[in-house]
Amino acid sequence: VGDNFFMNVYGKLMDSGKITIGNNVFIAPNVSIITEEHAMDAVQRAQGLEYTHPVTIGDNVWICTGAIVLPGVTIGDNSVIGAGSVVTKDIPPNSLAVGNPCRVIRTLEQE
């Protein structure tokens, strides 16, 4: 976890795998960051088999209320993830990304 990190109430870090969080990251209420997933095969799932994939959150990122960040995702520096978004794939730096599945709708200019 980097400097000047803030996570609001009811946030969840499901960290069986590694979560890396940069500097100046703000996480709103009810955000979930998940690093593990269950096997798709029913027999393996019943045996409790899980896989983990790291999550990386860059510097100056804001993740808005109720967003879910799924295993293996990287969110690039200076990006904003909209409220209620489900981040299933990497988000490039300087992006405003929203929706389910989350997609980039605009590039953010840095001042």
Label for each model-derived stretch:
Residues 1-73, 100-101, 106-109:
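Flexible, glycine/small-residue-enriched loop-and-beta-strand segment within the central core
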Residues 76:
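Helix-turn-helix DNA-binding module
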Residues 97:
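Conserved active-site beta-strand element of glycosyltransferases/polysaccharide synthases
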